[in-house]
């Protein structure tokens, strides 16, 4: 294959389950030099009179050059082609609570944004998933006896941690000696027929980080607190606080939530809503087996793209496992009819996050969409994005 380019953008999406790949070589700039492109099992090579650029693929991915098909040139985008691959991508999600020994260690809860210690040296003896919101209906339909837990809330004991879709429930009774996170002010509300007003906290009071003032969660009762997964890092007390860029952490947590929920409940459509019940984003999970490799600039040096690196620097790797989603922004009263349809559909699952995090996620999706080749940015009325895992 031959083309002319001064700089060429390379985009490669590998699908682990389908064992296929989409390769896009960006449209060259005017006046670019002739360039020969070679596709080899472990690399892509681009030669110009000035030199050679080679892009090394991760060890887990091998292309099948002879399977090249669907070759076409898309104006404004570049050269498109599809290939078969031999890919062994690790898609197993690792939770901090997967290992039974982890629950016997002392853990420390940190604010992810600033590293403030929220709960120190908590020994978690039981880490349990919460039942789904349809649990009561299932019991009533399939069991011959009434549900003994009807209309009762599940509250963790002193050394428990209950895991919801996007949050942790913990008991703060044993943490009273510590400096606790701030609570939002109580609100005035009328509670009697005589319209006498008294101070009464909201049903779910915001829990705020004292250092950075980020919303971490909500109080469920006098002893139980809900912490959102996107705001808290739970780490063994023997380890130091891990510094992770905010955008990387948010999209990784959301991606894992989507994958786990789709696997457990066969749910692929989600509404992302704030703690104020306002819907910010409609998300549709397309697939969770993508490996995206991209080179944003041409260089005469060899570029290597390891599959997963232990560093979280944004420029350290251009290869990453990801989930592919369709999304619709719903801020400023956009897509109101579609939001209403999705909210009334029992197959759509709501995910509640702090309102500020919903806006962060929308920015992350928008940036991902803007970085895609132009032909991949839309599917019908939905926008396309990748969330790194």
UniProtKB/Swiss-Prot annotation:
GO terms for biological process: proteasome-mediated ubiquitin-dependent protein catabolic process; protein autoubiquitination; protein monoubiquitination; protein polyubiquitination. Its main location: cytoplasm. Pfam families: HECT_2. Residues 235-257 are annotated as: Interaction with UBE2C. Coiled coil: none annotated. Zn(2+) binds at residue 144. This is E3 ubiquitin-protein ligase E3D. GO terms for molecular function: cyclin binding; ribonuclease inhibitor activity; ubiquitin conjugating enzyme binding; ubiquitin protein ligase activity; ubiquitin-like protein conjugating enzyme binding. E3 ubiquitin-protein ligase which accepts ubiquitin from specific E2 ubiquitin-conjugating enzymes, and transfers it to substrates, generally promoting their degradation by the proteasome. Independently of its E3 ubiquitin-protein ligase activity, acts as an inhibitor of CPSF3 endonuclease activity by blocking CPSF3 active site. It comes from Homo sapiens. PANTHER family: E3 UBIQUITIN-PROTEIN LIGASE E3D, E3 UBIQUITIN-PROTEIN LIGASE E3D FAMILY MEMBER. Its EC number is 2.3.2.26. It is an enzyme of class 2 (transferase). Residues 353-389 are annotated as: HECT-like. The modification N-acetylalanine is found at residue 2. The C-terminal half (AA 188-389) is able to bind cyclin-B and shows a self-ubiquitination activity (mono-, poly, or multi-ubiquitination) in a HECT-like sequence dependent manner. The BRAT1-like motif mediates inhibition of the endonuclease activity of CPSF3 by forming hyrogen bond and hydrophobic interactions with the active site of CPSF3: Cys-144 coordinates one of the two active site zinc ions of CPSF3. The keyword Cytoplasm applies. Interacts with UBE2C/UbcH10 (E2 ubiquitin-conjugating enzyme). In vitro, interacts with cyclin-B. Pathway: Protein modification; protein ubiquitination. The keyword Transport does not apply. It is found in: Cytoplasm. It comes from the Eukaryota. A motif (BRAT1-like motif) lies at residues 129-159. One of its GO terms (cellular component) is nucleus. It catalyses: S-ubiquitinyl-[E2 ubiquitin-conjugating enzyme]-L-cysteine + [acceptor protein]-L-lysine = [E2 ubiquitin-conjugating enzyme]-L-cysteine + N(6)-ubiquitinyl-[acceptor protein]-L-lysine.
């Amino acid at each position: 294959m031959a083309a002319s380019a001064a700089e060429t953008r390379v985009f490669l999406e590998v699908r682990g389950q389908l064992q296929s790949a989409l390769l896009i070589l960006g449209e060259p700039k005017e006046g670019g030099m002739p360039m020969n492109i070679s596709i080899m099992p472990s690399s892509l090579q681009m030669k110009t009179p000035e030199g050679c650029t080679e892009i090394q693929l991760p060890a887990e991915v091998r292309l099948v050059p002879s399977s090249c098909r669907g070759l076409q040139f898309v104006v404004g985008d570049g050269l498109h082609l599809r290939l078969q691959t031999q890919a062994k991508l690790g898609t197993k999600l690792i939770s901090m609570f997967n290992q039974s020994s982890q629950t016997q260690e002392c853990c420390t809860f940190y604010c992810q944004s600033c590293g403030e210690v929220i709960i120190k040296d908590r020994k978690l003896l039981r880490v349990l998933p919460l039942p789904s919101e349809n649990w009561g209906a299932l019991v009533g339909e399939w069991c011959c006896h009434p549900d003994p837990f009807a209309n009762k809330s599940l509250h963790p004991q002193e050394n428990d941690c209950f895991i919801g879709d996007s949050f942790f429930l913990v008991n703060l009774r044993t943490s009273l000696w510590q400096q606790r996170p701030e609570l939002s002010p109580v609100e005035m509300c009328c509670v009697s027929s005589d319209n006498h007003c008294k101070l009464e906290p909201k049903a779910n009071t915001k829990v705020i980080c004292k250092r950075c003032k980020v919303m971490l969660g909500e109080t469920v009762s006098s002893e139980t607190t809900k912490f959102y997964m996107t705001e808290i890092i739970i780490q063994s007390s023997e380890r130091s606080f891990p510094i992770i860029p905010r955008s990387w952490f948010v999209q990784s947590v959301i991606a894992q939530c989507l994958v786990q929920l789709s696997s457990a409940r066969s749910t692929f459509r989600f509404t992302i809503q704030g703690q104020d019940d306002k819907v910010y984003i409609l998300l549709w999970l397309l697939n969770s087996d993508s490996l995206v490799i991209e080179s944003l600039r041409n260089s005469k040096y060899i570029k290597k793209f390891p599959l997963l690196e232990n560093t979280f620097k944004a420029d350290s790797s251009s290869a990453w496992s990801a989930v592919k989603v369709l999304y619709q922004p719903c801020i400023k009263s956009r897509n109101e009819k579609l939001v209403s349809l999705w909210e009334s559909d029992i197959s759509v699952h709501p995910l509640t996050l702090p309102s500020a995090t919903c806006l962060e996620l929308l920015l992350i999706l928008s940036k991902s969409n803007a970085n895609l080749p132009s032909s991949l940015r839309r599917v019908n009325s939905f926008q396309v994005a990748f969330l790194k895992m």
